[in-house]
């Protein structure tokens, strides 16, 4: 089939819901939910712990710098150990942070297997790390209050070689430092360093960087900032830590000289004419069209019609032709490394309710051809003509294509069709629940502190009923201009056979940044882990996570019981919501998951005796003269300072030499993927075949690669024959010409 102009796609969700808004108002004395407080700044945590580290959270070696010294850059993947003294929630948050690195960058991690260089994550005092690979075992401390995904990403970036953003030599062009407002003896944290010490990797100053100080870092007066931005609009942006910025990722990939991610299989926003290599079906009745946002009723999801000459999507017109006519749109051939994928996309159906939108896969037939079709999910038309998000779980282990099939249900009663935009295929699980809240701007404007919206019930993979509560203007905090988010359990169909109280489950709530490219999303993720210690006097000291029909309250909206809530009354600022793409299309999207972490209770493995903590650590702003003009007295530590150890002096301080045994090391299977790192040479694709790495080699028109690791280059036989023929012909022609010339000379 020929391309015309396109719009396309559809989806499946484990559990999805678009909110019919019902706002509940807080009555005096009726609020018994638990607020865990706001996320504390890293430096606030470290100050409370009595730590005075270099730049607030760095143990700095005297002699090397990973931004300039290639030997301090890690060999990927990076080995790690999760110490048993870590909180269970911290372990889950660390693994979640690893997945963000795998999804958005070329950096990867692997469980420790005796390597000389590795990272051990421990619960020591405060949140801190070292800069770069120290060529020995080294700590990252995830202490009390540090177990947030973004905080962990921040400390890992230090370990990968990054300093704070405002340490750049050109920072005074972009921010103001109010020296008189800085706590005495902490001024060193605001020093800048020249290009001989750190490098910006040829990138611009980044207010949104995960590595930027907040406006109130190390301040004397809690209401007066120590750092403000030259562009006032960024004063409320710096220091907010939702996720990596786009420039953070550019620097990370430049530092490690690689660009490919590990778990992103495909992405398409249809902004380019080649529509990401997708192809039309050849045996169907019609084609998908590559549409744009030139018409008011045809607005894309990527740019929501805000850019003239841009904003494309795929579209299948269901208002013309005959009932039952269909059009296929297929992806390029994809090679998975893991056994599970999540296909996420945005779609809308504006035609007849009888229209159908289906997701299929075309699989390897075991003879090398991708041809066997299997239906995965069907979507039916409805009266909601807004863009919707969809998630479809795939379980492909061999090469495959995903396929979108649109079918006309009743052209005579259709005035539109099926739209598709912003496709993302990752090798990660789909969320258990997806809650879309429409008209969010009106909700933010018309609600007050304490007003709340309660999500419908979702089910996780174990069968627990879960949900979230949204506080559009916060819950009970004194600060205004914030959105709150909490988690609760619902009674459900499976309660009779489930474990109660439910413990060791990590509740994960994500407010989605709807940026088209998942690598550039700065979504906010909050998580905590259930415990039998989480009780409430409102239920006579019972565990909050006991069976909801026993300790919860009846909710007529779901005809079920709902537990007390646990979460954050001040989760994210309205300014950040409006600055990014959290409110695209005037909709707020929230993901919810509930994952069992019991297998992570015992994760520690003994480290090699040869691996020791590096000597020569600088603390308290005591960097050497080579590191800054305003440096102070240096202190050389011969071992990990006692102030950084455990809070409980009666307990033996852990080091990388005292890690103890590990029992039931039940890591997810994908951590042992033989294709991580890719063993294939010459841009070959690695495929996991029954636990063994199998290389799919690149083939061109003239040359192809072969061998177990695609290490040998060959010339195609047809081209080789042609070359031999050409050479033989050239020799013959030369001989004839020479003979003819000699004959003429003799005459």
UniProtKB/Swiss-Prot annotation:
Residues 1-20 form the signal peptide. Changing residue 257 to Q: Increased susceptibility to heat-inactivation. Forms homodimers and oligomers. Inactive, impaired ability to form homodimers or oligomers. Its EC number is 3.4.24.18. Zn(2+) binds at residues 154, 158, 164. Inhibited by metal ion chelators EDTA and 1,10-phenanthroline, bradykinin analogs, cysteine, CONA65, and several hydroxamate compounds, particularly tyrosine hydroxamate. GO terms for biological process: epidermal growth factor receptor ligand maturation; signaling receptor ligand precursor processing. The half-life at 58 degrees Celsius is 50 minutes. SUPFAM superfamilies: Concanavalin A-like lectins/glucanases, EGF/Laminin, Metalloproteases ('zincins'), catalytic domain, TRAF domain-like. N-glycosylated; contains GlcNAc, galactose, mannose and a small amount of fucose. Coiled coil: none annotated. Disulfide bonds join 106-258, 127-146, 268-430, 675-686, 680-695, 697-710. One of its GO terms (molecular function) is metallodipeptidase activity. The active site is at 155. This is Meprin A subunit alpha. The gene is Mep1a.
